[in-house]
Amino acid sequence: MLLPKRTKYRKMQKGRSPGLSYRGNNVVFGEYGLMALEPSWISSRQIEAARRAITNYVKRGGKVWIRIFPDKPVTRKPAETRMGGGKGSVDHWVAVVKPGRIMFELAGVREDVAHEALRRAAQKLPIKCKVIDREEQGTMAKPEEVSSESE
Protein backbone atom coordinates (compact mmCIF):
# COMPACT_ATOMS: atom_id res chain seq x y z
CA MET A 1 0.00 0.00 0.00
CA LEU A 2 1.21 3.46 -0.85
CA LEU A 3 1.56 6.16 1.79
CA PRO A 4 4.05 8.98 2.45
CA LYS A 5 7.11 8.22 4.57
CA ARG A 6 6.55 11.37 6.60
CA THR A 7 4.37 14.47 6.37
CA LYS A 8 4.58 17.96 7.80
CA TYR A 9 1.10 17.67 9.33
CA ARG A 10 -0.72 14.51 10.39
CA LYS A 11 -4.23 15.56 9.38
CA MET A 12 -5.63 17.54 6.46
CA GLN A 13 -8.86 19.36 5.65
CA LYS A 14 -11.19 17.96 2.99
CA GLY A 15 -10.69 20.72 0.43
CA ARG A 16 -12.47 21.17 -2.91
CA SER A 17 -11.60 19.83 -6.35
CA PRO A 18 -13.00 22.14 -9.06
CA GLY A 19 -11.88 22.24 -12.68
CA LEU A 20 -9.67 20.07 -14.85
CA SER A 21 -6.20 18.70 -14.27
CA TYR A 22 -3.52 20.95 -15.74
CA ARG A 23 -0.64 18.78 -14.53
CA GLY A 24 -0.07 15.14 -15.36
CA ASN A 25 -2.49 15.14 -18.27
CA ASN A 26 -0.09 13.82 -20.95
CA VAL A 27 1.27 10.34 -21.55
CA VAL A 28 4.97 10.89 -20.84
CA PHE A 29 6.63 7.61 -19.90
CA GLY A 30 4.71 4.84 -21.69
CA GLU A 31 2.80 4.34 -24.93
CA TYR A 32 -0.71 3.99 -23.45
CA GLY A 33 -2.39 5.68 -20.50
CA LEU A 34 -5.51 5.53 -18.34
CA MET A 35 -7.13 8.97 -18.09
CA ALA A 36 -9.64 10.00 -15.42
CA LEU A 37 -12.85 11.55 -16.72
CA GLU A 38 -14.36 12.46 -13.33
CA PRO A 39 -13.04 14.08 -10.15
CA SER A 40 -12.57 11.73 -7.22
CA TRP A 41 -10.40 10.52 -4.37
CA ILE A 42 -8.57 7.29 -5.29
CA SER A 43 -7.48 5.32 -2.23
CA SER A 44 -4.17 3.49 -1.98
CA ARG A 45 -6.06 0.17 -1.96
CA GLN A 46 -7.77 1.05 -5.25
CA ILE A 47 -4.43 2.07 -6.81
CA GLU A 48 -2.91 -1.24 -5.71
CA ALA A 49 -5.89 -3.24 -7.05
CA ALA A 50 -5.62 -1.50 -10.43
CA ARG A 51 -1.85 -2.07 -10.52
CA ARG A 52 -2.34 -5.78 -9.80
CA ALA A 53 -4.98 -6.03 -12.53
CA ILE A 54 -2.56 -4.54 -15.07
CA THR A 55 0.46 -6.64 -14.07
CA ASN A 56 -1.64 -9.81 -13.86
CA TYR A 57 -2.95 -9.33 -17.41
CA VAL A 58 0.35 -8.39 -19.10
CA LYS A 59 2.18 -11.21 -17.24
CA ARG A 60 5.95 -10.69 -17.57
CA GLY A 61 5.92 -8.25 -20.47
CA GLY A 62 5.59 -4.50 -20.32
CA LYS A 63 6.38 -1.77 -17.84
CA VAL A 64 3.80 0.02 -15.68
CA TRP A 65 4.06 3.56 -14.33
CA ILE A 66 1.77 4.76 -11.53
CA ARG A 67 1.36 8.50 -12.05
CA ILE A 68 -0.68 9.26 -8.92
CA PHE A 69 0.36 9.00 -5.28
CA PRO A 70 -1.91 8.98 -2.21
CA ASP A 71 -0.60 11.93 -0.22
CA LYS A 72 -3.85 13.09 1.43
CA PRO A 73 -4.81 11.56 4.80
CA VAL A 74 -8.48 10.73 5.42
CA THR A 75 -9.54 10.59 9.06
CA ARG A 76 -12.32 8.56 10.62
CA LYS A 77 -13.83 8.52 14.10
CA PRO A 78 -14.70 5.18 15.72
CA ALA A 79 -18.21 3.75 15.33
CA GLU A 80 -20.87 4.85 17.85
CA THR A 81 -18.84 7.86 18.98
CA ARG A 82 -20.59 11.09 19.91
CA MET A 83 -19.93 14.30 18.03
CA GLY A 84 -17.03 16.45 19.14
CA GLY A 85 -13.90 15.35 20.90
CA GLY A 86 -11.65 16.46 18.06
CA LYS A 87 -10.83 15.15 14.62
CA GLY A 88 -10.57 11.38 14.22
CA SER A 89 -7.38 9.44 13.60
CA VAL A 90 -5.98 8.82 10.11
CA ASP A 91 -7.82 5.89 8.53
CA HIS A 92 -6.39 5.71 5.01
CA TRP A 93 -4.62 7.75 2.32
CA VAL A 94 -6.04 9.01 -0.98
CA ALA A 95 -4.84 10.64 -4.19
CA VAL A 96 -6.92 13.59 -5.37
CA VAL A 97 -7.68 13.06 -9.07
CA LYS A 98 -9.20 15.65 -11.40
CA PRO A 99 -10.62 15.02 -14.89
CA GLY A 100 -7.87 14.69 -17.50
CA ARG A 101 -5.29 13.21 -15.13
CA ILE A 102 -3.25 10.26 -16.42
CA MET A 103 -3.26 7.70 -13.59
CA PHE A 104 -1.42 4.74 -15.13
CA GLU A 105 0.89 4.32 -18.10
CA LEU A 106 1.93 1.16 -19.89
CA ALA A 107 4.62 0.34 -22.46
CA GLY A 108 6.30 -2.68 -24.02
CA VAL A 109 3.14 -4.62 -24.95
CA ARG A 110 0.87 -4.90 -28.00
CA GLU A 111 -1.93 -2.36 -28.39
CA ASP A 112 -4.77 -4.84 -27.80
CA VAL A 113 -3.08 -6.20 -24.66
CA ALA A 114 -2.48 -2.67 -23.33
CA HIS A 115 -6.08 -1.60 -23.94
CA GLU A 116 -7.48 -4.69 -22.21
CA ALA A 117 -5.09 -4.38 -19.25
CA LEU A 118 -5.97 -0.72 -18.72
CA ARG A 119 -9.69 -1.51 -19.14
CA ARG A 120 -9.39 -4.07 -16.35
CA ALA A 121 -7.62 -1.51 -14.18
CA ALA A 122 -10.45 0.96 -14.85
CA GLN A 123 -12.92 -1.61 -13.49
CA LYS A 124 -11.15 -1.41 -10.12
CA LEU A 125 -11.48 2.38 -9.88
CA PRO A 126 -14.57 4.31 -8.67
CA ILE A 127 -14.60 6.70 -11.65
CA LYS A 128 -15.11 6.67 -15.40
CA CYS A 129 -11.83 6.36 -17.26
CA LYS A 130 -10.57 6.44 -20.83
CA VAL A 131 -7.71 4.48 -22.37
CA ILE A 132 -5.59 6.76 -24.54
CA ASP A 133 -2.55 6.37 -26.77
CA ARG A 134 0.44 8.67 -26.79
CA GLU A 135 -0.67 9.99 -30.21
CA GLU A 136 -4.22 11.01 -29.19
CA GLN A 137 -3.29 13.18 -26.23
CA GLY A 138 -5.30 16.14 -25.05
CA THR A 139 -8.64 14.85 -26.35
CA MET A 140 -11.15 15.23 -23.52
CA ALA A 141 -14.08 15.70 -25.94
CA LYS A 142 -16.15 12.65 -26.99
CA PRO A 143 -14.26 10.07 -24.91
CA GLU A 144 -14.50 6.33 -25.52
CA GLU A 145 -15.52 5.68 -21.93
CA VAL A 146 -14.61 2.67 -19.86
CA SER A 147 -16.95 2.76 -16.90
CA SER A 148 -16.58 0.90 -13.65
CA GLU A 149 -20.37 0.93 -13.21
CA SER A 150 -20.97 -1.31 -16.25
CA GLU A 151 -21.43 -5.00 -15.45
UniProtKB/Swiss-Prot annotation:
What UniProt keywords apply to this chain's record, in alphabetical order? Ribonucleoprotein, Ribosomal protein, RNA-binding, rRNA-binding, tRNA-binding
- What are its GO biological-process terms? translation
- Gene Ontology CC annotation, any one: cytosolic large ribosomal subunit
List each coiled-coil range. Answer: none
* Xref: SUPFAM superfamilies: Ribosomal protein L16p/L10e
Q: Superkingdom of this entry's organism?
A: Bacteria
Please name the Pfam families in this protein's record: Ribosomal_L16 (PF00252)
Classification via PROSITE patterns: RIBOSOMAL_L16_1 (PS00586), RIBOSOMAL_L16_2 (PS00701)
GO MF terms listed in the record are: rRNA binding; structural constituent of ribosome; tRNA binding
Under the subunit heading, UniProt states: Part of the 50S ribosomal subunit.
What does the function comment of this entry state? Binds 23S rRNA and is also seen to make contacts with the A and possibly P site tRNAs.
Q: Which family does it belong to?
A: Belongs to the universal ribosomal protein uL16 family.
The name this protein goes by in its record: Large ribosomal subunit protein uL16
The scientific name of the source species is: Chloroflexus aurantiacus (strain ATCC 29366 / DSM 635 / J-10-fl)
